Amino acid sequence: MKSARKFLLALSVVLLPVLALGAVAPGKAPAKAAAKPAPAAKGVTFTDITAASGVKFTHNSGRSGKKYLPESLGSGVALFDADGDGWLDILLINGRDWDPKGRTSLPALYHNNHDGTFTNVIRGSGLDVQMYGMGVAVADYDNDGREDVYVTSLDGDRLFHNEGGGKFKDVTAASGIRNASFGTSAAWLDYDRDGKVDLFVANYVQWSRDKDLWCSLDGAIKSYCTPESYKGTGSKLYRNLGGGKFEDVSQKAGVGDPTSKSLGVAVLDYNGDGWPDLFVANDTQPNKLYRNQGNGTFKDEALEAGVAFSEEGTARGAMGVDAADYDRSGRPHLLVGNFTNEMLALYHNEGGGVFVDEAPSSTVGQVSLLTLTFGVFFFDYDLDGLPDILAANGHLEEEINRVQPRIQYKEPPLLFRNLGNGKFATAAVGSAFARPMVARGAAYGDLDNDGDLDVVFTTNHGPAVVFRNDGGNRNHWLRVKTVGTRSNRDGLGTVVRVTSAGGKQWTLVRTGSSYCSQSEIAPTFGLGPDKVVQTLELEWPSGTRQRFTNLPANQVVTVDETKGIVGAGVGVVKAK
């Protein structure tokens, strides 16, 4: 976020020129002209099906003219199978009024009816709790085969245990989780590889209604303050002790820096040592790259790696984040959504613990310069085997155009198609997808079980939007669901590798990423024209390794860590 940040930027350039050396690509300079949009993959369209689907959700930011900081941020969305019927449901997080107005603002849990429609079943689900919710993370923390839900909230975070049948129970008090801070994004991961998933919670700033500050864009009218105005606060790491109990190990583990102002978190293994690391996006503070040392502690390597600052040596307004191997180099790279006039960051993992920001010299940076990006992720929307980029955009101030004519409050999302060899081009996938909105959370998953990946956006103080992917499944695909036995039940931290005639791909099974949201856990591999997966290999956190050969495309494969493939063919469809 940004107000009078020019002084800070100038000061950073003078005092910190050496800090960003790891982030500068030698010999590279920003291109002089933006690249022309390239056509999308043939026949792929994102169709707005919100009205037809029955999703009728409007986010309540609580805004009433007082310009409280949280009102500008918005909440997230999770796509997961809440009731175990094999279809993704939609959980939309909500805020609330600051003062009672005789209405109740609840989250929404949309049950998938298996026919392209959804029904809100929040009432009586146990998730029907009024709170000023922000983010959501989903995983099976007790290894009982059902997905549990963690919600960050200004009223105190909540942990909901999945009781089965789409019913949940608030177990926060009994769990030992006590995050009373300004929680935003969260991620489940088994950082100590003991077979039980732990919880990382990103916290933002020290804010309360009675300590809200007065800020202005023009010196006359109150506007939303930027995070520079508030002190930071430490994020939290809760170790799963088993039996539904958690222990706060934030300080002991080395991830509780009190100066942080965190909005996004991504789980990755950037050095390939088999231990899950964390990248934390900070707003006007240096980003964090926590290297898992394999002994219960982490070390921040962001400065040395070149991901703490921009290449000018300043901390950007970082919000959403994701990680993926977009160029088949065998290493995960980082994507970060930033503030207006800061562009997306696309940190390429060079190996040896060093990253280079490729965005300034690429279409990704040029096109995203003026947008303000919250939700971001890599996903293969056209199933050609190359991860593409989506950015959900929208400004904080409704009046921003009055003081910055080139900047708009509502902004269209950006979709960058991966052309191979590390190159991206903007993609046109229908007029509805290009509609400006005040987007915040963003998640992807196969809502209709047809193979390709659909998208859900949340908007701040506005409606949720559901986009169906039409035509992505003209290419072939394989989805892999992992069921841990020695490892955690969800298989989080498992490396999945796929080889077909078109080459090799891999990913890490994980949660988190984007902004305050969670996408489908089971990874989907695009295969392009390939109809057969030659090899499917899994490396589990326990050390178990599995290898399967000659699997037909266009199916969901369920792999049990002990038994091997226990289900295949569920969701098989013919490419359209």
Language-model features and meaning:
Residues 122-141, 146, 151-191, 201-228, ...:
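Asp-box/WD-like beta-propeller blade repeats and closely related beta-sheet repeat scaffolds
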Residues 74-84, 111, 132-146, 161, ...:
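Beta-propeller blade termini
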Residues 93-104, 203-230, 391-409:
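Short, conserved, GDST-rich strand-edge loop motifs in beta-rich repeat architectures
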Residues 107-112, 233-240, 291, 348-349, ...:
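Beta-propeller blade signature
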Residues 23-36, 42-45, 53, 63, ...:
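Gly/Ser/Thr/Pro-enriched helix-cap/hinge segments flanking short amphipathic alpha-helices
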Residues 46-49, 117-126, 167-177, 244-256, ...:
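Blade-edge beta-strand/turn elements of extracellular beta-propeller
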Residues 87-94, 144-153, 199-203, 277-282, ...:
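Hydrophobic beta-strand segments that make up the repeating blades of beta-propeller
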Residues 55-76, 103, 125-137, 176-187, ...:
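Repeat-based blade/solenoid architectures
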